[in-house]
Design a protein with these regions (language model features):
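Short, small/polar residue-rich loop motifs at catalytic or cofactor-binding pockets
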Residues: 2-5, 60
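Asp-based phosphoryl-transfer active-site loop
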Residues: 4-21, 221-224
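Hydrophobic "anchor" residues on beta-strands that sit immediately upstream
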Residues: 7, 64, 217
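Active-site phosphate-binding/coordination module
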Residues: 25-122
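Alpha-helical scaffolding segments of alpha/beta enzyme cores, especially the outer helices
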Residues: 29-32, 54, 165, 198, ...
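Short, hydrophobic beta-strand segments that form beta-sheet elements in well-ordered domains
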Residues: 43, 217-220
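Glycine-rich beta-strand-to-loop/alpha-helix junction loops that act as flexible
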Residues: 69-70, 219-221
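Conserved acidic, metal-coordinating active-site core of Asp-based
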Residues: 112-217, 224
Length: 228
C-alpha cells in the first residue's frame, strides 16, 4: 500500500515561532520529526512575503507559502506538475492573489474611522518605531513587516467600540475584519482557510496522480487561524 502524504499547515507567531522572541528554537524537534516523516510543512501567516522569504531560507523550506491572512499564495515555479488555475508568474513564483489591494484597504480604513468617530491606526499610519514597539521586531524586521500588499493590521484606540459596528462598516465596503495575536486585521474576502483549501486541492490532485492518500493538519493559536 502506498504511504499517505502528510501536509501540515502552520501559523507562525505563537505557533511555529515564539510569540515574543519570534524564534523557532523550541520547535526544532518538531521540525526534525516532520522531515523524518517526509511530511510537507506549509507556512501560513499574517506576515508579509518580505518577512516570510527570509524565514523560509533559514528553515530550508522550499514549499508554497500563504501570506497576509490568505491574501495570496506563492508557489515555487514548476512545483506542481500541472497548470495552476488563476496563477500568474512573478519572479520565481506562481502567485494566486485572493486578497484586496492594500491601497483600497487604506482608503476604507480612513472612511470607517471617520464614519464611526473612532481612531483606527493601521501600519500605514504608524512610524517604523511605533510598529517596532508594538511588535517587538527589530528595525530591519519592522521594515519588512510594513511592506503590506493584502492586509492591514490595525490598532483600535477607541474604548467601547462595538465589534458589530466595526464589522458592519467593513461589510458595507465588501471587506471584513479578523483578529490575530496582536492586532485586528482589515482585509477583503480572503482568509487563511480560503487560501489553504485552494492549496490543498492542488496537493490532492498531485496525490491522486501518485496513487497516494493525503492527510492534512492545521495548527494555529488565534481566531484568524480557525478557518485553516
Amino acid at each position: 500500500m502506498t504511504k499517505a502524504h502528510i501536509l501540515i499547515l502552520t501559523d507562525l507567531d505563537g505557533t511555529l515561532l515564539d510569540a515574543t522572541t519570534y524564534s523557532y528554537e523550541a520547535a526544532t524537534g518538531a521540525l526534525s520529526a516532520i522531515q523524518t516523516l517526509g511530511a510537507t510543512l506549509i507556512l501560513v501567516s499574517s506576515k508579509t512575503r518580505s518577512e516570510m522569504e527570509p524565514l523560509r531560507l533559514r528553515l530550508d523550506n522550499r514549499h508554497p507559502f500563504i501570506v497576509e491572512n490568505g491574501g495570496a499564495l506563492f508557489i515555487p515555479m514548476g512545483y506542481f506538475p500541472f497548470p495552476l488555475e488563476q496563477a500568474a508568474p512573478r519572479g520565481d513564483y506562481e502567485v494566486v492573489e485572493i486578497g484586496t489591494p492594500y491601497v483600497r484597504l487604506r482608503t476604507a480604513l480612513k472612511e470607517i474611522g471617520r464614519d464611526l468617530g473612532c481612531r483606527l491606526r493601521g501600519f500605514g499610519d504608524l512610524s517604523l518605531e511605533e510598529v517596532s514597539d508594538l511588535t517587538g521586531l527589530s528595525p530591519a524586521e519592522t521594515l519588512l513587516a510594513t511592506q503590506r500588499e493584502y492586509d492591514e493590521p490595525v490598532v483600535v484606540e477607541s474604548n467601547g467600540m462595538a465589534w458589530n459596528r466595526l464589522s458592519a462598516a467593513a461589510a458595507t465596503r465588501g471587506l471584513r475584519w479578523t483578529r490575530g495575536g496582536r492586532f485586528y486585521h482589515l482585509m477583503g474576502g480572503n482568509d487563511k482557510g480560503v487560501a489553504s483549501r485552494r492549496l490543498i486541492a492542488w496537493y490532492e490532485r498531485r496525490a491522486q496522480q501518485e496513487g497516494r492518500a493525503l492527510i492534512t493538519v492545521g495548527i494555529g493559536d488565534s481566531p484568524n487561524d480557525l478557518p485553516m
